[in-house]
Amino acid sequence: MGIKISTGEPGGHNYLKPELIKDIVSKLNGTIVENCTAYGGKRQRLEDHLKCVEDHGFTKIAKVDILDSEGEFSIPTKTGSIHLREDIVGSHLENYDSILMLSHFKGHMMGGFGGALKNMSIGVASTKGKLNIHSAGAENQEQEYVWSHLPAQDDFLESMAEACSAVMDYYDNKGGIVYINVINNLSVDCDCDSNPEEPCMKDIGIVASLDPVAIDRASLDLIYKSNDPGREHFLERVETRHGAHTIEHAVTLGLGTTFYEMVSIDK
């Protein structure tokens, strides 16, 4: 089983720590999987990314596979997609019959928030796939061009949902995907940031589902329902980026539902 996490950009410190996830990784006998980035930093070059993985302690708890280390392949997006005809993913993805999408739920500079949908779209995409999503499928996907010619915000958010549709359809024919969101270290910034803002809210908990739409909606709802004094600051990041639109477009594509029942397993 592949366990998809964010390995965290060096300099950042809010990513899911090995000591937190090691038990579930061991229980599943899983391999931690990740892809290289598309914005420079210390995880775009394979050699740098492998050093990051080791420095952050992930190699001490499991095998780690950088999915696009030996190439990539394309999978079609769902009928009804507006921007993307395909999602470009790391070639090693085909080695995994099932995936645990183990996501750190937090804010995000571009997407408003990051959870299961972000991890499954940007996270599963190769470097080229990330540029495909961030450009909303634009013809010119050269890295420098993409970052200086970003699309309309909703086009980007919709492209994330469309990339998710490709990954979900791919795994419908395999062993499927399980989603876990860990709602802790609630910074407004993503784990891809080398200098993230400190968490502005207390940890909330862990949510699990077979539905990526429901889990992200439920995670976001837990923020809205919180009495934490940092709630407004976090939600400002979400709302100014129209973050919930990713969820809305995912519903339109038939990826899941925003109607859910929350079952507590607290002892």
List each language-model region with its residue ranges.
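Extended, low-polarity segments enriched in aliphatic/aromatic residues
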Residues: 1-267
